[in-house]
């Protein structure tokens, strides 16, 4: 794990980062953030939890330059399940992303929105406030609209991405 990232407590709440996680350089993790085992947090990511919590499940990868943030009112948490991929430069704000989902590069998921299990949000999509992307569906566009089911090849690619980022993190920090 890199030693050049920032971890900061906020109002007595400190991030919890298991030793099995890999956090790259130039990441900032503030407040009530709890990472699950074997998470990979790529360079430049900011995770902030001042009012609520950010909880990230195991084996989840958060790619370069993502922003994950609670809102300013109590209970405006970010919950990200296990085996989730959050693509480069995605923004997650006070939302829920369930197990096995994929958030594409540059996508935005706003307050109260929910991306259900094994759903896929395409690159650049905007999941608007309080909307739901149902389990196993692909959503695209601004605003994001469900287009179809996620197919078996895409589900396999989503699983492969988890394995690839875990291996990538390991390769970077080989001794």
PLM segments and residue spans:
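Short proline/glycine- and basic residue-enriched helix-capping loop/turn segments at helix->loop/beta transitions
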Residues: 85
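Glycine-rich hexapeptide-repeat left-handed beta-helix
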Residues: 1-12, 50, 58, 64-67, ...
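A positional/architectural concept
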Residues: 12, 16-61, 65-72
């Amino acid at each position: 794990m890199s030693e050049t990232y920032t971890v900061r407590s906020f109002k007595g709440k400190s991030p919890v980062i298991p030793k099995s996680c890999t956090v790259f350089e130039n990441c900032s993790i503030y407040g009530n953030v709890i990472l699950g085992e074997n998470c990979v947090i790529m360079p430049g990511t900011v995770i902030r939890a001042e009012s609520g919590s950010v909880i990230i499940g195991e084996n989840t990868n958060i790619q370069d330059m993502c922003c994950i943030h609670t809102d300013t009112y109590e209970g405006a948490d970010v919950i990200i399940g296990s085996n989730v991929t959050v693509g480069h430069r995605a923004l997650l704000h006070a939302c829920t992303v369930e197990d096995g989902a994929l958030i594409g590069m540059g996508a935005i998921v706003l307050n109260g929105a929910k991306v259900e299990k094994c759903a896929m949000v395409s690159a650049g999509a905007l999941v608007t406030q309080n909307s739901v992307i149902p389990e196993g569906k692909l959503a695209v566009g601004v605003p994001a609209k469900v287009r179809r089911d996620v197919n078996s090849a895409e589900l396999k690619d989503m699983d492969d991405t988890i394995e690839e980022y875990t291996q990538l993190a390991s390769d970077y920090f080989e001794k």
